[in-house]
Amino acid sequence: MNYQVLLYYKYMTIDDPEQFAQDHLAFCKAHHLKGRILVSTEGINGTLSGTKEETEQYMAHMHADERFKDMVFKIDEAEGHAFKKMHVRPRKEIVALDLEDDVDPRHTTGQYLSPVEFRKALEDDDTVIIDARNDYEFDLGHFRGAIRPNITRFRDLPDWIKENKALFADKKVVTYCTGGIRCEKFSGWLLKEGFEDVAQLHGGIATYGKDPETKSEYWDGKMYVFDDRISVDINQVEKTIIGKDWFDGKPCERYINCANPECNKQILVSEENETKYLGACSYECAKHERNRYVQANNISDNEWQQRLTNFDDLHQHA
């Protein structure tokens, strides 16, 4: 495989995010890179793909900048680009928590745990493990025994914690996410909220999955990623499928977006059921006039109506 996917972030000061984004985009395009990078006054958060030569040049370029000289890159081999385009965008935050009183992880964040230390936390009955990702990420793969917050956006996590605070009373709290960036801010927020013993998996699931000592122990399923790959394997020793098909509950790791553009819900579904249910999550979405699956597959009105009857068995409409 001649391509690499880079995942990285750093909380630091960027004085002029707009100018930085403009210059950085030009550099990335000149090196034929594709991906998504967010920059703000609080730092940089990026994931991009390119050939090994191009991504190595990018990392060397970043490390030559005093501001990014110690930035850690998580690297995955790939068969091709993981993105279709290259975007570098200035933002208010590099990860959106939307707090009234923002948290600066450079000053307030949970204790960092190495993969080995995190594995010990997983084995400790007095430690609560909180998955700081969205529910659809959790449903594809997670650490055994972790708590699944019922959220679809990171910014909703603080409210969910407040509503379920009784679950964590007098416990040590350890949190984890994909690459570590969400936990940096989230664990700092937990400390501000009065949780006294807070820690985080340093480098996230991506780092744990490559650790030679832990060998991905206690991880089940796949890790969701925000690029064209959708998911990657983490546990190289014991592979399990924990995802369940939206319609029949059978083991499934295939994500699609609901074909109704006004819904766009992510669901796990087999190719067979995607065909059967017109790429939609519900009867209402399947019959929507702008159903993308119907349009893309040139399905006739008669066939459309026929497949809608498949929902009768699901009792999803009156």
Swiss-Prot record:
The function of this protein is: Catalyzes oxygen-dependent 5-hydroxyuridine (ho5U) modification at position 34 in tRNAs.
Q: Which Pfam families match?
A: Rhodanese, Rhodanese_C, UPF0176_N
Q: What organism, scientifically named, is this protein from?
A: Staphylococcus aureus (strain COL)
Any idea of its EC number? 1.14.-.-
**What PROSITE patterns is this protein classified in?**
RHODANESE_3
Family as reported in the entry's similarity comment: Belongs to the TrhO family.
One annotated GO molecular function is: oxidoreductase activity, acting on paired donors, with incorporation or reduction of molecular oxygen
**Which residue positions are annotated as catalytic?**
C177
Q: Where do the Rhodanese domain residues begin and end?
A: 123-217
Record-level GO BP terms: tRNA modification
NCBIfam families xrefs: PRK00142.1-3
Could you say which enzyme class this protein belongs to?
oxidoreductase
Going by the UniProt record, its keywords in alphabetical order are: Oxidoreductase, tRNA processing
This protein is called tRNA uridine(34) hydroxylase
Report the catalytic activity.
Answer: uridine(34) in tRNA + AH2 + O2 = 5-hydroxyuridine(34) in tRNA + A + H2O
Task: Check the record and name the PANTHER family matching this protein.
Answer: RHODANESE-LIKE DOMAIN-CONTAINING PROTEIN 7-RELATED (PTHR43268:SF3), THIOSULFATE SULFURTRANSFERASE/RHODANESE-LIKE DOMAIN-CONTAINING PROTEIN 2 (PTHR43268)
Q: Which SUPFAM superfamilies match?
A: Rhodanese/Cell cycle control phosphatase
